UniProtKB/Swiss-Prot annotation:
One of its GO terms (cellular component) is small ribosomal subunit. The gene is rpsJ. It holds the Pfam family Ribosomal_S10. Part of the 30S ribosomal subunit. One of its GO terms (biological process) is translation. GO terms for molecular function: structural constituent of ribosome; tRNA binding. The keyword Ribosomal protein applies. The keyword Ribonucleoprotein applies. Keywords: Ribonucleoprotein, Ribosomal protein. It comes from Fusobacterium nucleatum subsp. nucleatum (strain ATCC 25586 / DSM 15643 / BCRC 10681 / CIP 101130 / JCM 8532 / KCTC 2640 / LMG 13131 / VPI 4355). This is Small ribosomal subunit protein uS10. InterPro entries: Ribosomal_uS10 (IPR001848), Ribosomal_uS10_CS (IPR018268), Ribosomal_uS10_dom (IPR027486), Ribosomal_uS10_dom_sf (IPR036838). The lineage of its organism: Bacteria, Fusobacteriati, Fusobacteriota, Fusobacteriia, Fusobacteriales.
């Protein structure tokens, strides 16, 4: 029995850009007749880096940087060929990564 469920994972550093893209994808999937669940926020991955400010001495003086990767998931149930083709026509801004998996 073939499954018609698709999961769309979105990743971006900017959460506002990510939310707008997720909304666009969900709207285009709803217009094509698929049942949409989401966008669901997934845990944000935070990477922290600590570096010395000085090259040689002063270990007490450090600088900390962090990189946050925000993620969202959209689930499409009863996705048709029309829904999949409408997903390919959605224009996403630069900086938003997309991954589509069939469940």
């Amino acid at each position: 029995m073939a499954s018609n469920k698709l999961r769309i994972y979105l990743k971006a550093y900017d959460h506002t850009l990510l939310d707008e893209s997720a909304k666009r994808i969900a709207e285009s999937a709803k217009k094509s007749g698929a049942i949409v669940a989401g966008p669901m926020p997934l845990p944000t991955k935070i990477r922290k880096y600590t570096v010395l400010r000085s090259v040689h001495v002063n270990k007490d003086s450090r600088e900390q940087f962090e990189m946050r990767v925000h993620r969202r998931m959209i689930e499409l149930v009863n996705s048709t060929d029309k829904a999949i083709s409408s997903l390919t026509s959605v224009h996403l801004p630069a900086g938003v990564g997309i991954e589509i998996k069939q469940v």
